[in-house]
Structures are given as structure tokens and as C-alpha cells.
């Protein structure tokens, strides 16, 4: 048996019950692309795509590593940074695969809290207090998965200075960042910060499996060496498709932000007045985190039996919570929210 399985992804891929109305997917539904890419092998694709990613993020191609989605980018970033015995310090609650990838690579893992009392914010002092002499990487998500809390540039600057003082790096998974207009990627705030991202959550192009690391060129070279132990090179077809449709990204992003605003309003209207519930969604976020204090796994099963999908907070290390996403069809979202509202109102006292 493979050590360190990922319970959340096991649930998503094999155990998550099918439903008609879904609040579980945290990204824009998969989109078709109007322009097909070249079917002829092209050795310049990776270079041209790296240049396009660099230009979109106001940097140069030597700061770009191309990977198989954000997940692949995170694997290679952690492989590049976690030398033998190096430790990962990860936020909690968090996206389950982020820390389990480090554990799979053989790294010890510790956690620092993003507490609900602080609206799930990152406190650099709390991070520094949890560092050990073997910590090599701190990992956070921005927007925070599962709460959608943001991390301001001022906090990133402090984290970068802390990382420099301790000779470590901060990995910032920013796959959701483009839901925030005008947000500056972490790697541009401080050289000890690195960004991972992809075309998946905001752009609805997860089926291309294209992601990236943005960071210090030496780190990028190390990630390229790590790649030699996995896929070696990226396949041409998704790179060709991405480049052929690159000019569509701004429009896709604006549409995704509009979806997020509309869905958040629907969620606030459906759930914001419930007694005994803490639910204060950011009205530009793609999802929110609801606290009700009960059995989140059982409530998710009940909702699924009634045709609505929600994600239990237990998969993020936060039992008693639900992650609710709202980027799908508005009518399906309304129906799912109605089912969830009924389940919460009728839960045992």
C-alpha cells in the first residue's frame, strides 16, 4: 500500500456520491476551447508557454517552471526544497494534499493554526513560533482553502523577511488568487516566497493539466532536476491548446469573478440568517466555510441523499464545518443551497 494516502482526493475520485446539485467543486466548471492547437510536435512549445506565463505575471521565463497543474507544481516545489530531513510547516486548516505530498516525500510535517477567531488570517508571529531547526518550507494557500480568506501583501512581506532570516522558503499555493482583482502574486513580494498556480480553478481548464511555479531561478532549476524523476517533459497537446487560446484568459477570468459574486450572494441569502451558524462569505470568493458544530460527515451524507453535494470540513482538519462552493449553474446552486438550509434547520439541537 502506498504510504500517506490522501483521504480528500480518495473521497473526491472514488467515494464522493453523485448528486444533481453540487456545492463541492471549488473551481469554474470545465470549459470548451474554440481554437485547437497544432497536432505537429513542436520543440518550442514549453519555451513559448513559459514566456507567456512569465508575461502574464510580470516576470521573465527563468522564473517559471511549468508543471502538471498546481498539484504537479506543488510536488516539484516541495521536492526541490525539502532536502533529506527537511521539515514542512503547514497551515491548519488546509488543503489535505498540500501537506500529505510532503509526507509522501519523506518530510516531517508540523502545523500552525489559522484560527477562526482571527477570521482565518495568517499571523507571522504564530508561524515563526512554530519553526524548528529543521524547517525548510512553510506552506500556505491564498486564497485560503477551505475558507477563502485572503493574505495581504503586508503580511506576505513579513513572511518573506522571516523566511530570509531563517534561511527557508514560503510556498504559496495561489491557484485561486485570480478571483481577487489586482492581487499581486506572492513571488513578486519577496524573493523567499514562491507561487504555484494553474489554469484550473479560475479558468475552468483543469483538463489541460497546466500549472506553474513562479520563483527564484535557482529554485526553478532545482524543480527541473526533480522533474527528471517523474514526467521528464510536459506533453505537447495541452501546451499547444493553451497557447492557441491564451488571449481568452482575461475574459474567462472576468466571467469567473462574476460567477463568484453571484454565487456568494445566493449563499448569503440562503444561509446567512440561520441560528447557531457562523457563515460570513466574502462576496467575491468562489467558496466559503460554514461552521455549525455538528457531524459534518453525516450532514454531507444527508445532503447527498437529497441530491445536494457539500464538502465536509473534516477533510481540511476542521470538523464541524462545511466548505460550500458556488461556481456552477445558478439554478442548481439555489437548489443545493435550499437542501443544505433544510438540513441545517432540522439538525438535532
Per-range role (PLM):
Residues 1, 80-140:
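PLP-dependent aminotransferase-like
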Residues 24-27, 243, 260-268, 278-292:
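Conserved glycine-rich beta-strand-loop-beta hairpin in the small C-terminal domain of fold type I
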Amino acid at each position: 500500500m502506498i504510504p500517506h494516502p490522501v483521504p480528500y482526493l480518495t473521497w473526491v475520485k472514488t467515494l464522493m456520491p453523485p448528486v444533481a446539485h453540487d456545492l463541492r467543486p471549488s473551481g469554474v466548471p470545465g470549459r470548451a476551447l474554440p481554437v485547437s492547437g497544432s497536432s505537429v510536435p513542436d520543440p518550442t512549445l514549453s519555451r513559448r508557454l513559459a514566456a507567456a506565463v512569465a508575461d502574464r505575471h510580470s516576470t521573465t521565463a527563468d522564473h517559471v517552471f511549468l508543471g502538471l497543474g498546481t498539484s504537479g507544481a506543488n510536488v516539484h516545489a516541495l521536492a526541490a526544497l525539502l532536502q533529506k530531513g527537511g521539515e514542512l510547516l503547514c497551515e491548519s486548516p488546509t488543503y489535505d494534499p498540500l501537506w500529505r505530498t510532503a509526507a509522501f516525500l519523506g518530510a516531517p510535517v508540523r502545523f500552525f493554526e489559522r484560527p477562526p477567531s482571527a477570521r482565518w488570517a495568517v499571523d507571522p508571529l504564530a508561524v515563526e513560533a512554530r519553526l524548528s531547526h529543521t524547517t525548510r518550507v512553510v506552506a500556505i494557500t491564498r486564497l485560503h482553502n477551505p475558507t477563502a480568506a485572503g493574505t495581504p501583501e503586508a503580511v506576505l512581506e513579513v513572511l518573506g523577511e522571516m523566511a530570509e532570516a531563517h534561511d527557508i522558503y514560503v510556498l504559496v499555493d495561489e491557484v485561486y488568487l485570480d478571483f481577487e482583482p489586482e492581487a499581486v502574486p506572492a513571488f513578486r513580494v519577496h524573493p523567499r516566497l514562491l507561487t504555484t498556480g494553474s489554469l484550473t480553478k479560475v479558468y475552468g481548464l483543469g483538463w489541460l493539466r497546466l500549472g506553474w511555479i513562479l520563483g527564484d531561478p535557482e529554485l526553478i532549476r532545482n524543480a527541473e532536476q526533480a522533474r527528471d524523476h517523474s514526467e521528464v517533459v510536459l506533453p505537447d497537446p495541452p501546451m499547444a491548446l493553451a497557447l492557441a487560446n491564451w488571449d481568452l484568459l482575461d475574459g474567462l477570468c472576468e466571467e469567473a469573478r462574476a460567477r463568484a459574486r453571484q454565487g456568494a450572494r445566493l449563499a448569503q441569502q440562503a444561509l446567512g440568517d440561520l441560528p447557531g451558524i457562523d457563515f460570513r462569505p466574502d462576496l467575491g470568493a468562489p467558496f466559503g466555510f460554514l461552521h455549525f458544530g455538528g457531524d459534518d460527515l453525516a450532514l454531507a451524507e444527508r445532503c447527498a441523499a437529497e441530491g445536494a453535494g457539500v464538502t465536509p470540513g473534516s477533510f481540511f482538519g476542521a470538523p464541524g464545518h462545511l466548505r460550500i462552493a458556488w461556481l456552477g449553474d445558478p439554478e442548481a446552486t439555489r437548489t443545493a443551497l435550499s437542501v443544505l438550509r433544510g438540513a441545517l434547520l432540522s439538525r438535532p439541537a
